[in-house]
C-alpha cells in the first residue's frame, strides 16, 4: 500500500509555531522582522488566525479579510506555509452582547460573562451560524491560496455547558440511547435508590452543583454527552472545510492529560 504524503510541498518536517500577526497589524516593521526571524530559525510553517475573530469581523457583518491574505502572501514568498485556524476558540464582544445564548451556563446555573476563551455553548444554533459565516469568509479569501497546507479547527476544545439548550439536547441524547424507554434508564442507573426514579426523560437534568449529582450513571452519561456534543460541534466546522476545500487536511490540537473529554472518541 502506497503512503500518502500530506505536505509534498514541504521538504522535511513541519517546523513552526503559533503566529498572531493580527495583534501587530499597525506595526509592519514587526511583521517584517517576524519573517526574518522565522527564516533564521528555518521554520517551514506557521499556525495563523487562532484567536483572530475580532480582527476578521470587528463588528457584526463588517469583514476585514485583506490582512490575512497579505500575511499568507508574505509567508509564502519566503518559503513558509500556513496552517490556518478557524477562530471559534474566542469570540468578539459584539457577539456575546447581542447573542448571550452563545455564552455557557456553569454548573451553578449561572450564565458566564464575556471573556476568557472556550466558554461558548456548542449547542447554540446562533453560535454555529456565526462560526459558519466567518469560516466561509475565510475560505472565500484564502481557500485556494498556494501557501495553505492545513486547517486547524478552533483551539484546545474543552469544558461543558448547563444551559437550557444543552439540557434539552442531553435529554434527547439519553432518549435515543435508551430507546425512548425511561424504565430502561432507571434500571441502568439504579434510580430507585433514594427514590430518584424518573417518569419521563424531560425530568432529567444535568448534574448541577445544587442538583442531582449522586447518581453515578447520570454523571457518567453527562461526561459522555459532553464529549459527544463537542464532537458534534467539531463536525459542523469540519463539514464546511471538507466540502469547500476537500484536498486540504483538517486537524485540531488537544491537551495532554485533560480529563474533561474522551479523546478516544
Stretches with model-predicted labels:
Residues 20, 47-52, 85-94, 149-158, ...:
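Short, solvent-exposed turn/loop segments enriched in Gly/Ser/Thr/Pro and often Arg
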Residues 2-4, 29-36, 70, 138, ...:
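Alpha-helical scaffolding within the catalytic cores
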Residues 112-265:
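Polysaccharide-binding and catalytic clefts of secreted carbohydrate-active enzymes
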Residues 5-27:
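Boundary/entry segment of secreted carbohydrate-active catalytic domains
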Residues 31-112, 136-139, 236-244:
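Aromatic-lined substrate-binding rim segments of carbohydrate-active enzymes
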Residues 12-15, 48-52, 118, 215-219:
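A short alpha-helix capping/helix-coil boundary motif
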Residues 20-30, 54-66, 92-93, 159, ...:
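Acidic-and-aromatic substrate-binding clefts and catalytic sites of carbohydrate-active enzymes
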Residues 10-15, 42-44, 76-82, 144-149, ...:
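Short, well-ordered coil/turn segments that N-cap beta-strands
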Amino acid at each position: 500500500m502506497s503512503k500518502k504524503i500530506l505536505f509534498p510541498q514541504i521538504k522535511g518536517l513541519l517546523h513552526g509555531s503559533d503566529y498572531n500577526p493580527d495583534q501587530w497589524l499597525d506595526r509592519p516593521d514587526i511583521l517584517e522582522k517576524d519573517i526574518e526571524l522565522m527564516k533564521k530559525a528555518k521554520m517551514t510553517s506557521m499556525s495563523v488566525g487562532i484567536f483572530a475573530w475580532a480582527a476578521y469581523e470587528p463588528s457584526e457583518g463588517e469583514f476585514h479579510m485583506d490582512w490575512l491574505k497579505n500575511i499568507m502572501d508574505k509567508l509564502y514568498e519566503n518559503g513558509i506555509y500556513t496552517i490556518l485556524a478557524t477562530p471559534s476558540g474566542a469570540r468578539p464582544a459584539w457577539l456575546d452582547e447581542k447573542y448571550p445564548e452563545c455564552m455557557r451556563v456553569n454548573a451553578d446555573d449561572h450564565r458566564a460573562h464575556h471573556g476568557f476563551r472556550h466558554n461558548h455553548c456548542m449547542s447554540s444554533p446562533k453560535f454555529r451560524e456565526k462560526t459558519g459565516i466567518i469560516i466561509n469568509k475565510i475560505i472565500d479569501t484564502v481557500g485556494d491560496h498556494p501557501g495553505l497546507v492545513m486547517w486547524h479547527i478552533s483551539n484546545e476544545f474543552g469544558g461543558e455547558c448547563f444551559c437550557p439548550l444543552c439540557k434539552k439536547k442531553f435529554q434527547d441524547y439519553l432518549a435515543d440511547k435508551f430507546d425512548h424507554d425511561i424504565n430502561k434508564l432507571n434500571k441502568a442507573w439504579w434510580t430507585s435508590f433514594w427514590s430518584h426514579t424518573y417518569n419521563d426523560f424531560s425530568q432529567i437534568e444535568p448534574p448541577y452543583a445544587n442538583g442531582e449529582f449522586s447518581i453515578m450513571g447520570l454523571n457518567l452519561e453527562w461526561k459522555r454527552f459532553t464529549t459527544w456534543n463537542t464532537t458534534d460541534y467539531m463536525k459542523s466546522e469540519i463539514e464546511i472545510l471538507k466540502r469547500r476545500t476537500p484536498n486540504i487536511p483538517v486537524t485540531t490540537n488537544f491537551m495532554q492529560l485533560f480529563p474533561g473529554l474522551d479523546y478516544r472518541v
